[in-house]
A protein has these predicted regions:
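Membrane-proximal, non-transmembrane interface segments of integral membrane proteins
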Residues: 1-33
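Polyanionic, low-complexity intrinsically disordered segments
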Residues: 3, 8-16, 74-77, 116-125
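Alpha-helix N-cap/helix-start motif at coil-to-helix transitions, marked by capping-box chemistry
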Residues: 9, 31, 35, 73-83
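Hydrophobic alpha-helical packing segments in soluble, helical-rich domains
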Residues: 25-55
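Short, charged amphipathic alpha-helical segments flanked by flexible coils
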Residues: 45-75
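Charge-enriched, short contiguous segments at helix-coil
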Residues: 77-125
Length: 125
C-alpha cells in the first residue's frame, strides 16, 4: 500500500479501538474516526487520480471523488453523515455513546468498501 504512495490508516483499519473508546469518550472516538475517514478519502483520491489541494476539506474531497465517479451517491451520503457528526464532536457538540456507535456502524460499511477497492488495485486512468 505504501509502495503506491498511500497513507497508512492510524489503526490499520481496525475500528474496534474506536468502539471501546466510544464507551468512555464518544467525542474523542469520533475525532479519531474523522482522521481514519480522511485518510481513506485521500488514498481513494490518489488511486483514482483525483487532484487535491493541500487544504481541501473532507467534504470537498468527497465531492471531487463523486464527480470523478470514484464513489457512488450512497457512499457520498454515508461519508457526509460520518463527517458531519465527527466534525460536530470535534467542535464541542456532546455526542452520546450510542450515537458514536451508530456512526461507527456506517463507517465500518465504508471501510469494508474501501478494503474491497484496495484488493482490486488502482483504476488505470
Amino acid at each position: 500500500m505504501l509502495n503506491f504512495g498511500l497513507q497508512p490508516s492510524p489503526t490499520g483499519l481496525e475500528f474496534s479501538h474506536y468502539r471501546i473508546l466510544a464507551e468512555q469518550d464518544p467525542n474523542l472516538a469520533l475525532a479519531g474516526l474523522r482522521m481514519e475517514v480522511e485518510t481513506m478519502l485521500k488514498n481513494l483520491s490518489k488511486g483514482f487520480n483525483v487532484s487535491l489541494e493541500e487544504r481541501d476539506s473532507a467534504g470537498i474531497i468527497t465531492r471531487k471523488l463523486k464527480e470523478k465517479g470514484a464513489i457512488t451517491s450512497q457512499q457520498t451520503e454515508l461519508v457526509s453523515a460520518v463527517i458531519q457528526l465527527c466534525n460536530a464532536a470535534i467542535h464541542g457538540t456532546k455526542v452520546l455513546s450510542y450515537q458514536a456507535q451508530e456512526i461507527l456502524d456506517i463507517a465500518e460499511i465504508l471501510r469494508d468498501e474501501y478494503v474491497s477497492w484496495l484488493s482490486w488495485g488502482f483504476q488505470d486512468n
